């Protein structure tokens, strides 16, 4: 299993994970459920109409936190918002109810991955494994 696959596996096992962004000078955290490992990058998706996307546009610093029952993950870096239409199509294929809502409301899904990123797999007391990802 590759390093990025290890990180993806923890996020998958967690089911719900958390995305932290910056809003002005304040942190904002919210739960997310969608992620997709595609071309050796983990993509996340949020609506471009949402505050979270606007926060990422203004300040690309972001962090994912997840707990899979065994490991705590901190995965942080710079959100690359260039998008990937193939990822959006796959997201809508995997989540048809979301696709319907987005289509009905004329919304767009913004997908991003973390670049210049660090992933820390931790226990309660220390970092067990650490990985760097630069694309």
Where are these regions (language model features)?
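General beta-strand recognition
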Residues: 18, 42-43, 74, 120
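A short, Trp-centered hydrophobic/proline-enriched beta-strand micro-motif
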Residues: 9-23, 62-64
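Short glycine/serine/proline-enriched coil/turn segments at secondary-structure junctions
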Residues: 26, 70-71
